[in-house]
From Swiss-Prot:
Bias type Acidic residues, positions: 133-143
UniProt xrefs under CDD domains: DEXHc_DHX57, RWD_DHX57, SF2_C_RHA, UBA_DHX57
Residue numbers covered by motif DEVH box: 668-671
Ranges of residues in domain Helicase ATP-binding: 554-721
Protein name in the entry: Putative ATP-dependent RNA helicase DHX57
Length: 1386
């Protein structure tokens, strides 16, 4: 049980009402009452009295423990909602069943025993042996005053024990607890300006002595700045100590007279502090004024705090007991007066700033400068500024010591001079306020005594010296008296350091071996140049427009480090420019051979371009030309031109920030403005300043090349014209005219009635849409030429007369169709009519392939089905057409089919998303039909919701699509939007992806790169070419803090380091880590692989019902994720029986074999990553796992039984999902119960599935996606569901979800668990009261809360130090097994 949590009394019967002012608390009827209960907080009702806990900690009649600052549920009231604000969608009257938190007697006893044992370990390690059981209950783990005594006094000696009397104990090895660093001591030291990691390491070295630790840090810090000036001269050594002591006492007396109570001699002749009121500092760094809390405590009735008497009460002024010293306090065998100076400085005078003067033993002040420290509790004052002030003051102290003058009052005067101190505030960086490069791991608060719990680790501590300044251990407990807990301790754990070393080794550049390889490559290239095959391909390359600019490009690269190349589609920039650079270098000396990396936005383009270039070089891919994508790498030691995805290069930068051995970075398709490419530009902009030899080439479309040139300090731009035949461009009005398309009444592509104004609706009365248009047509005969419409008004809002005025020269029949057409919809009927006109119509354009651009897979399926019912396209009578869908979800083999030229007389029709816009080039395309729409990810930062929305393309997209035609002959492009819409409504450029996606993963990537780790996120994002909105960044930082990956001061936690090293969404990464900790690694990796890639369930167009029924057969525990797990297990079993069996299993169960294989590959890669960071067996490699696998993915066997002992526990797996996905929780609202009369009485009826309502806290009502196994469920045992993502289409949908029960939410839900007494029931709440349960008893509530506290601490320890083996560690193993049993049996 965490000893940092104080036990509080059981609430009395408070009489407060739920108004804005709490009522007066009732009296407690306990026998040991220490006062009446406090009044209830605003709106919270009356508070109860407190009584001290008895030694029987968890008896039913005993106190329950709540957090020190319980938060009331935030329930919106009408008075708090202004007129302009929307009313919150969550309402407290929601019909959500309030579940009860039960615990069996057996489990209660098990948890009690565990907590007692854990508490005894803490008490034994941190308290005196003579304390009673009652005192042990409240003993803090940081208490160990036996190590300290007042200066000048010695502890009483205990007589030697008779050796015969204790002979039986000789063989018993005494218990030596692992030393635990007090978090309050760390917080105390950090307020002097030192980094918490440094504080921890020094405290451990000094056995927790805060005074010794502070003096050591100050000495080390000052010695680096002042060096020789700190040495004591021989003359000073001759001065008598008595003389120095006399002068020091005189100065202390004078300071007491001048400063009054502000001056405190904490330890006689050793430590002085002077309280300061530096208003200029406070106002300069004021952010928010903390609210003052009021107290209503009867002081006289309180007992004296025993920790205060010992000198180390960490609660200070917040302590609920009296801080008074009896006349003669007896402690142990020593009669002494208690040194309460550690409290007086805070309680007697609340100063934000203190000047601290320290004298070591035998110090010769004023002939020797004292140690000077500037201390502040103002959290807004940067740590570095505090150290700069201390150094400034110590410099003055050294100067005064040279003339043997007292310095303290002069230092006070200096601090009060604003002009002097303000100069020091500009520098917010200091070596000792930043973490060191290497440091010792922080020891766990969880005491682990078994040697097997830790692997042997040799720490490397670069900043703690071997010699400790000789400091007398006085009775000085300098821990913080604040009750708000320590700041998070950040540890770059050793496993992550090892991971970075391993990554760096992958990219070690050995110049000697590389140059030797280069010599062979040059020789082979010269030989190859003479071959016929090479010369034949060279002639084709020389016909490309890019070849004409070859010398210009090479000359510019010799003069400039960064060059922007702007080229039209088809100019050859992607394939030729890297070869220009490589060929030029191969004709030179071996040490000058280029090593080029060319990034591509998509995997398909990286593969296809690499294969094309290798073919042009008359070699197979993987030699001098290779590619690398996630999970697939085709390259060798001879590869000098590598095509890779942008993510692969960013991952390399984590371990190789200098890009060793790389001569050129080419960023292709930079105009697409993906999140990764924009971030890569920022990284490269930093690297080029550090590596003058690295050259960067940005390749872009023609529209925005200047934007990138300006970003790189106006670097030169080369424009390459495209090699395309003329392309005739037509718009919607032209397409309607050539096809003579007529919109039928009742068509789904007609405008809705809502789009017609109310005035026209009244005038229309009962006329149909066509009758209305006929009337407009008649009136248009009188339309005057001067009638016009503003260009800003979109066509969708215009009626017939207005359209006729806008489109002069267009036939009235076309205008008639346009006036009733819904331009927001993709008109598949018109596309079919255009295809018929192209394939079978009479026109002068040459035959060729047709490329149709549609927004997404759904539209592709609909058009494909529609064309299958048309005899011209279905090939039932004649083989006229061949239709190929093209989508990123298709396999590489399926995608390659679009490049195959059809037989003569057969028209190839490709129905594609925007993947065909820039990523691939299909040479034989003559016709392009552009629907004008695309799927674009949008992100609402305020709701934390992603949506995939149909949006209009930009002008740049439209030009790119047009450019796909005319590669081999004159082409035609039909845009299914009007010419006016193109000229006046379309954006010039698409919104950059970084401005419309969540930023969590990018934040982690920024922080894991050494070049940005010390910068705040806002400053890094502001340097992007077009930064995202600050609201989006703020929301991402909040989510990362809630997840435990980022601290409030924007530093990575240990969990953050691990999540940053995993190339997945942060929630998926957390699922993998928790699966490892709770020994259900294999199923956790399976679910993680599916979430990172896609679901293996498929739904054929003509067998949707059958496919859904098959998926329901896998349904288990109301969870899509567990259904997926069941399906994957079945596939693994089938693979062991052979390829045929695996194929049949997938076909019968509507599963994608390709997706399952990709998931298996991902699982192996994730296993390797977990092995690298210490969360799986050491040395696991994905390739080795695949080789050893005998059917299936091989992960279960590779990771071992220990890591998967709970792999068959579905309840625990659901709990892991809760740990990873929280706070993505949906409430299930049930309608009021309906009853049906039967012969035995009224029976409650199950509600229909449609009657259930699903609500999220921030977004209100959502819907379960029809593909979910929970879509038709009528009853859920628990009213809470977890989900990974929300999507917004026509409505807000939860795609996949999983029911979660009470215990996983309480134990693994993020944030604070609150326990409150409401109407006689103990209510356990999460998330500000949005999730609530009723505890069966207050004992159950307390047990669960205390167990949660222990679990949180254990998880922190494991994540900080992955070398802890929770399987063999007694403490960790017991906590884990208890949690597993609770989750499984309750």
């Amino acid at each position: 049980m965490s000893s940092s949590v104080r036990r509080k009394g059981k609430p009395g019967k408070g009489g407060g009402k739920g108004s804005s002012r709490g009522g007066r608390g009732g009296r407690s009827h306990a026998s040991k009452s220490h006062g009446s209960g406090g009044g209830g907080g605003g709106g919270g009702g009356g508070g109860g009295g407190n009584r001290k806990a008895s030694s029987r900690i968890w008896d039913d009649g005993d106190d329950f423990c709540i957090f020190s600052e319980s938060r009331r549920p935030s329930r919106p009231s009408n008075s708090n909602i202004s007129k302009g604000e929307s009313r919150p969608k969550w309402k407290p009257k929601a019909k959500v069943p309030l579940q009860t938190l039960h615990m069996t007697s057996e489990n209660q006893e098990k948890v009690k025993a565990l907590l007692r044992d854990l508490q005894e370990q803490d008490a034994d390690a941190g308290s005196e042996r003579g304390l009673s059981g009652e005192e042990e209950d409240d003993e803090p783990d940081c208490c160990n005053d036996e190590r300290y005594w007042p200066a000048g006094q010695e502890p009483s000696l205990v007589p030697d024990l008779d050796p015969l009397e204790y002979a039986g104990l000789a063989s018993v090895e005494p218990y030596v607890p692992e030393f635990t660093v007090s978090p309050f001591a760390v917080q105390k030291l950090s307020r002097y300006g030192f980094n918490t990691e440094r504080c921890q390491a020094v405290l451990r070295m000094c056995d927790g002595d805060v005074g010794a630790s502070l003096e050591h840090l100050l000495t080390q810090c000052f010695s680096e700045t002042f060096g020789e000036r700190m040495k004591i001269s021989e003359a000073v050594n001759q001065i008598s100590l008595d003389e120095c002591m006399e002068q020091r006492q005189e100065e202390a007396f004078a300071l007491k007279s001048i400063c009054g109570e502000k001056f405190i001699e904490r330890i006689q002749n050793r430590v002085w502090t002077i309280g300061l009121e530096l208003e200029y500092l406070t106002s300069r760094f004021r952010k928010s004024k903390p609210k003052e809390s009021t107290k209503n405590v009867q002081e006289n009735s309180l007992e004296i705090c025993k920790f205060y008497l010992k000198g180390n009460c960490k609660f200070g002024s917040k302590c609920r007991f009296k801080h008074e010293v009896p006349p003669n306090q007896i402690v142990g065998r020593i009669e002494r007066s208690v040194d309460d100076s550690h409290l007086n400085a805070i309680e007697d005078a609340s100063f934000l700033y203190e000047l601290e003067i320290r004298f070591s033993k035998d110090h010769k002040y004023p002939y020797q400068a004292p140690l000077v420290a500037f201390y502040s509790t103002n959290e807004n004052l940067p740590l570095a500024c505090r150290l700069h002030i201390s150094e400034f003051l110590y410099d003055k102290a050294l100067t005064f010591a040279e003339t043997s003058e007292p310095v303290v009052y002069s230092l006070i005067t200096l601090l009060e001079e604003e002009s002097e101190i303000v100069k020091l505030l500009t520098n917010t960086h200091h070596k000792y306020s930043d973490p060191p490069v290497n440091f010792l791991p922080v020891p766990s608060r969880t005491r682990i005594n078994n040697p097997a719990c830790h692997k042997t680790v040799i720490p490397n501590n670069s900043f703690v010296s071997n010699q400790i300044p000789e400091v007398e251990k006085a009775s000085e407990s300098e821990e913080s008296d604040e009750d708000d807990g320590p700041a998070p301790v950040i540890v770059e754990n050793e496993s992550y350091v090892n991971l970075k070393k391993k990554i760096s080794k992958r990219y070690d550049w050995q110049a000697k071996s590389v140059h030797a390889e280069n010599g062979k490559i040059c020789k082979q290239f010269r030989m190859k140049q003479a071959s016929r095959q090479f010369q034949s391909i060279l002639q084709e390359r020389q016909s490309l427009p890019a070849w004409e600019e070859r010398e210009t490009i090479l000359n510019l690269l010799r003069k400039h480090q960064v060059v922007v190349i702007s080229g039209m589609t088809g100019c050859g920039k992607t394939t030729q420019i890297p070869q220009f650079i490589l060929d030029d270098s191969l004709n030179g000396p071996p040490e000058k051979v280029a090593n080029i990396i060319c990034t591509q936005p998509r995997r398909i383009s990286a593969i296809s371009v690499a294969e094309r270039v290798a073919k042009e070089r008359a070699e197979r891919v993987g030699l001098t030309v290779g590619y690398q994508i996630r999970l697939e790498s085709v390259k060798s030691s001879a590869t000098r031109l590598l095509y890779c995805t942008t993510g692969v290069l960013l991952r390399r930068l984590e371990g190789d920030t200098a890009l060793q051995g790389v001569s050129h970075i080419i960023v292709d398709e930079v105009h697409e403005r993906t999140e990764e490419s924009d971030f890569l530009l920022l990284v490269l902009k930093d690297i080029v300043s550090q590596r003058p030899g690295l050259q960067v080439i940005l390749m872009s479309a023609t529209l925005n090349a200047e934007l990138f040139s300006d970003y790189f300090n106006s670097c030169p731009v080369i424009t390459i014209p495209g090699r395309t035949f003329p392309v005739d461009q037509f718009f919607l009005e032209d397409a309607i005219a050539v096809t003579r398309y007529v919109l039928q009444d009742g068509s789904p592509y007609m405008r809705s009635m809502k789009q017609i104004s109310k005035e026209k609706l009244k005038a229309r009365r009962n006329r149909t849409a066509f009758e209305e248009v006929e009337e407009d047509l008649r009136l248009s005969l009188h339309l005057q030429d001067q009638d016009s419409v503003k260009d800003a008004v979109p066509d969708q809002q215009l009626d017939f007369k207005q359209l006729l005025a806008r489109y002069k020269g267009v036939s009235k029949s076309v205008i008639k169709t346009m006036s009733i057409m819904d331009f927001e919809k993709v008109n598949l009927e018109l596309i079919e009519a255009l295809l018929e006109w192209i394939v079978d119509g009479k026109h002068s354009y040459p035959p060729g392939a047709i490329l149709v651009f549609l927004p997404g897979l759904a539209e592709i399926k609909m058009l494909y089905e529609q064309l299958q019912s048309n005899s011209l396209f279905n090939n039932r009578r004649s083989n006229r057409c061949v239709i190929h869908p093209l989508h990123s979800s298709l396999s590489s083999e399926e995608q390659q089919a679009v490049f195959v030229k059809p037989p003569a007389g057969v028209t190839k029709i490709i129905i594609s998303t925007n993947i065909a816009e820039t990523s691939i080039t299909i040479d034989d395309v003559v016709y392009v039909i552009d629907s004008g729409k695309m799927k674009e990810k949008r992100y609402d930062a305020s709701k934390g919701m992603e949506s995939l929305e149909d949006t209009f393309v930009s002008q740049a997209n439209a030009l790119q699509r047009k450019g796909r035609a005319g590669r081999v002959a004159s082409g035609v492009c039909f845009h299914l939007f009007t010419s006016h819409h193109y000229n006046h409504q379309l954006l010039k450029q698409q919104l950059p992806e970084i401005q419309r996606v969540p930023l969590e993963q990018l934040c982690l990537r920024i922080k894991i790169l050494e070049m940005f780790s010390a910068h705040n996120l806002q400053s890094v994002f502001s340097r992007l070419i077009e930064p995202p909105h600050t609201d989006s960044l703020r929301a991402s930082k909040i989510r990362l803090r809630d997840l435990g990956a980022l601290t409030p001061d924007e530093r990575l936690t240990p969990l953050g380091y691990h999540l940053a090293s995993l190339p997945v969404d942060v929630r998926i990464g957390k699922l993998m880590l928790f699966g490892s900790i709770f020994r259900c690694l294999d199923p956790a990796l399976t679910i993680a692989a599916s979430l990172a890639f896609k679901s293996p369930f498929v739904s054929p167009w003509d067998k949707k019902e059958e496919a859904n029924q098959k998926k329901l057969e896998f349904a288990f525990a109301n969870s899509d994720y567990l259904a997926l797990l069941q399906a994957y297990k079945g596939w693994q079993l089938s693979t062991k029986e052979g390829v045929r069996a695996s194929y049949n299993y997938c076909r019968q169960n509507f599963l994608s074999g390709r997706v399952l294989q990709e998931m298996a590959s991902l699982k192996r890669q994730f296993t390797e990553l977990l092995s690298d960071i210490g969360f799986a067996r050491e040395g696991l490699r994905a390739r080795e796992i695949e080789k050893r696998a005998q059917g299936g993915d091989g992960v279960l066997d590779a990771t071992g039984e220990e890591a998967n002992s709970n792999a068959e526990n579905p309840k625990l797996i659901s709990a892991m999902l809760c740990a990873a996905l929280y706070p993505n929780v949906v409430q299930v609202k049930s309608p009021e119960g309906k009853f049906q009369k039967t012969s035995t009485g009224a029976v409650r009826m199950q509600p229909k599935s449609a009657e259930l309502k699903f609500v999220t806290k921030n977004d209100g009502y959502v819907h379960i996606h029809p593909s979910s196994v929970n879509y038709q469920v009528r009853h859920f045992d628990s009213p809470y569901l977890l989900y990974h993502e929300k999507i917004k289409t026509s409505r807000v949908f939860i795609r996949d979800c999983s029911m979660v029960s009470v215990y996983p939410l309480v134990l693994f839900g993020g944030g604070q668990v609150n326990v409150q007494l409401q109407r006689g029931e103990f209510v356990v709440s999460l998330d500000d009261g949005w999730i609530r349960f009723v505890a069966a008893s207050h004992q159950v509530a307390e047990l669960v809360k205390e167990l949660r506290c222990e679990l949180d601490q254990l998880l922190q320890d494991k994540i900080k130090n992955p070398s802890i083996d929770l399987c063999t560690c007694p403490r960790g193993s017991r906590i884990i097994s208890t949690i597993v049993k609770l989750v499984t049996t309750q």
